[in-house]
Swiss-Prot record:
Chain segments annotated as transmembrane: 19-39, 54-74, 89-110, 130-150, 177-197, 218-238, 258-278
Source organism phylogeny: Eukaryota, Metazoa, Chordata, Craniata, Vertebrata
Record-stated family: Belongs to the G-protein coupled receptor 1 family.
GO cellular component term of the entry, any: plasma membrane
Gene: Gpr35
Name of protein: G-protein coupled receptor 35
Residue ranges, Extracellular side: 1-18, 75-88, 151-176, 239-257
Modification Phosphoserine occurs at: 286, 292, 298, 301
Disulfide bonds: 87-160
GO terms assigned for molecular function: C-X-C chemokine receptor activity; chemokine receptor activity; G protein-coupled receptor activity
Chief subcellular location: membrane
Length: 307
């Protein structure tokens, strides 16, 4: 069947549409609120720029940018079937910050791995300046790859989601490479950290509890990463691997992409929630100011408060 005869606009039952509207509204409100508070704490309430603080500040910025672009992306998906400037700009910001978020989570996992697995070399391998350089490099790589993806997309039928009559192989390859490589790194680093922590002898009950909490946090971070992003990229992998010759098949995968894409957006809220548990200094800084004169003690979550 000719692809031009297929309806590119997804139609959902009224109840599903209402659920999506409520879901998107809650996601926007909670995500903007949580990440704005997190960014305020990182910028104004913390006393020292650690590696953790630099990575998480960039992560909060990426999540906020994605959330701000989300209403325009949803509008263009529903009401526009061509590559308008608004569509290209909003979806470009959306995609850039999705994969920037993935890249930053990967950088945090590597930083944590270095701190725990190679503590003697951590001082020369880790520093706030190096963390800032990594963030700048990641922004440049992500934005550059998005520009290349945009040019390839325009050559192959369209950059915007709604204008693509088929899934462009080269542009999808950017998405798959931008996830599966970070996934392998995050899984490796997380397993290494958990292994080291499980073998580390505890000096007392307090340290044993701290080790257990740190291990749980590593597993939780890995679970959030996999649950939010893996379903979307599995659907992309299947879609690019199959020859979708019928409108029904394309419609099915378009619905799967829509649902898994919304699932991936929840990462913006979950990232903000993880801030409160990953960094003890974030918990201290987010408390109301007191009259205590005790000096601030910086805690780096990447060492998981165990070194």
């Amino acid at each position: 069947m000719n692809s031009t005869t297929c309806n590119s606009t997804l139609t959902w039952p009224a109840s599903v549409n209402n659920f999506f509207i409520i879901y998107s509204a809650l996601l926007l409100v909670l995500g903007l609120l949580l990440n704005s508070v997190a960014l305020w704490v990182f910028c104004y309430r913390m006393h020292q720029w650690t590696e953790t603080r630099i990575y998480m500040t960039n992560l909060a910025v990426a999540d906020l940018c994605l959330l701000c672009s989300l209403p325009f992306v949803l509008y263009s998906l529903k009401y526009s079937s061509s590559d308008t400037p608004v569509c290209q700009l909003s979806q470009g910001i959306y995609l850039a910050n999705r994969y920037m978020s993935i890249s930053l989570v990967t950088a945090i996992a590597v930083d944590r791995y270095v701190a725990v697995r190679h503590p003697l070399r951590a001082r020369e391998l880790r520093s706030p300046r190096q963390a800032a350089a990594v963030c700048v490099a990641l922004w440049v790589i992500v934005v550059t790859s998005l520009v290349v993806r945009w040019r390839l997309g325009m050559q192959e039928g369209g950059f915007c989601f709604s204008s693509q009559t088929r899934r462009n192989f080269s542009t999808t390859a950017f998405s798959l490479l931008g996830f599966y490589l970070p996934l392998a790194i995050v899984v490796f680093c997380s397993l290494q950290v958990v292994t080291v922590l499980s073998r580390r002898p505890a000096a007392d009950v307090g340290q044993a509890e701290a080790t257990q909490k740190a291990t749980h946090m590593v597993w939780a971070n890995l679970a959030v990463f996999v649950i939010c992003f893996l379903p979307l990229h599995v659907v992309l992998t299947v879609q690019v691997s199959l020859n979708l010759n019928t409108c029904a098949a394309r419609d099915t995968f378009s619905r799967a992409l829509s649902i898994t894409g919304k699932l991936s957006d929840t990462n913006c809220c979950l990232d903000a929630i993880c801030y409160y548990y990953m960094a003890r200094e974030f918990q201290e800084a987010s408390k109301p100011a007191t009259s205590s004169n005790t000096p601030h003690k910086s805690q780096d979550s990447q060492i998981l408060s165990l070194t």
